[in-house]
């Protein structure tokens, strides 16, 4: 949490991945090339296998209807006008601060912020893939959405931008936090209502550098996800795979993405019960934490990082982080060597708002100077 906030060139498909296009798939209009089995491009994912590799556990809870083809066609032409909505927030709103936690690195294929201050987000909703474009227009928020999930995204726009958050519930007990809150009046805690889209990248971030995790996320989403609906070709936006898509990723592709067996196995266990995990988005924090942590490999760090985004949980404090205890200790007690126990003790006055307190501490800029070299990224690709 403390440290987060180039496209890889396409690889030729392996021989086993060559397959005929799905029946009825045709080349889209407007000059978009059709997906070819052996020539993946930057704008379209490589054709996936129709069966998992040997040893990959079968998918149970998230199996699609019988007859669903594994091979996907290229994104269709986008001449359908988007659905639109305007919303007026009840107070100051800084889109960068609110939406920033959704961004997994500068080249996240599911998230973009462009030069004019517009934010783009590609996601997989309960209604299907969707793309959301959000921009500030004075005191209003203007949004447009494309794809099967467009209506779902626009309906959830206020919650996404923190309409359900109550920043006044936070009472600063330290001058640093009082000043930071005053300087950042547009901070709201977002709520996506989607668990898996935050859970999977959080699992990828376990025990590795953020650069390693971001690289793995980019590789897997671009290769096995789908082009985002709407006018997104120039942005390179992709929607992450559905649960079956994650389960179908061969073991060697996890290896190429530099994801070890422990993390990939955790993701595979999670996607098998994706529907049950998504139910956590409507639960109170203790019940939601329990639901996620029933999956082996998902602990307090991963569940907190997920529910901060999916549920907008103001008390979902991140424990087990390499840097956060020292940052909190330095900011509140001038003790940069604090551990989780000391961090939680310092955050006791903010019970119920501990996640918000840590966000404000990180935004304050009061962080200890680095004393040691950065953690060296691991690399299992050539093993």
What are these regions (language model features)?
Residues 1-36, 72-383:
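HhH-family (HhH-GPD) DNA N-glycosylase catalytic core used in base-excision repair
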Residues 25-27, 31-39, 43, 49-51, ...:
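Acidic, glycine-centered low-complexity repeats within long intrinsically disordered regions
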């Amino acid at each position: 949490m403390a440290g987060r906030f180039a496209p890889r060139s396409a690889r030729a498909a392996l021989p086993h991945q060559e397959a005929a296009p799905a029946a009825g798939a045709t080349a889209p209009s407007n000059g978009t090339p059709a997906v070819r089995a052996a020539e993946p491009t930057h704008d379209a994912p490589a054709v996936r296998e129709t069966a998992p590799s040997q040893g990959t556990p079968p998918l149970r809870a998230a199996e699609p209807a019988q007859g669903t083809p594994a091979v996907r066609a290229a994104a269709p032409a986008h001449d359908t006008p988007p659905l639109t909505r305007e919303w007026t927030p009840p107070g100051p709103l800084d889109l960068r601060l609110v939406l920033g936690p959704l961004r997994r690195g500068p080249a996240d294929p599911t998230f973009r912020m462009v030069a004019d201050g517009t934010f783009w987000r590609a996601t997989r909703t309960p209604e299907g893939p969707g793309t959301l474009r959000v921009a500030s227009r004075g005191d209003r928020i203007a949004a447009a959405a494309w794809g099967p999930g467009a209506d779902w995204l626009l309906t959830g726009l206020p919650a996404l931008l923190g309409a359900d958050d109550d920043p006044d519930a936070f009472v600063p007990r330290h001058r640093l936090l009082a000043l930071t809150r005053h300087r950042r009046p547009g901070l709201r805690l977002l709520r996506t209502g989607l668990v898996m889209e935050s859970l999977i990248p959080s699992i990828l971030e376990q025990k590795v550098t953020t650069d390693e995790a971001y690289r793995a996320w980019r590789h897997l989403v671009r290769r096995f996800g789908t082009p985002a609906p709407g006018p997104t070709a120039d942005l390179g936006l992709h929607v992450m795979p559905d649960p079956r898509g994650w389960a179908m990723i061969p073991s060697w592709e996890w290896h190429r993405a530099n994801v070890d067996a422990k993390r990939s196995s955790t993701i595979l266990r999670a996607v098998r019960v994706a529907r049950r995990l998504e139910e956590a988005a409507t639960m109170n924090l203790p019940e939601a934490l329990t639901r996620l942590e029933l999956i082996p490999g998902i602990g307090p760090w991963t569940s907190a990082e997920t529910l901060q985004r999916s549920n907008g949980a103001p008390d979902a404090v991140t424990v087990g982080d390499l840097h956060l205890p020292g940052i909190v200790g330095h900011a509140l007690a001038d003790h940069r060597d604090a551990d989780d126990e000391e961090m939680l003790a310092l955050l006791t006055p903010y019970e119920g708002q501990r996640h918000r307190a840590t966000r404000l501490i990180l935004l304050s800029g009061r962080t200890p100077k680095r004393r040691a070299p950065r953690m060296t990224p691991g690399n299992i690709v050539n093993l």
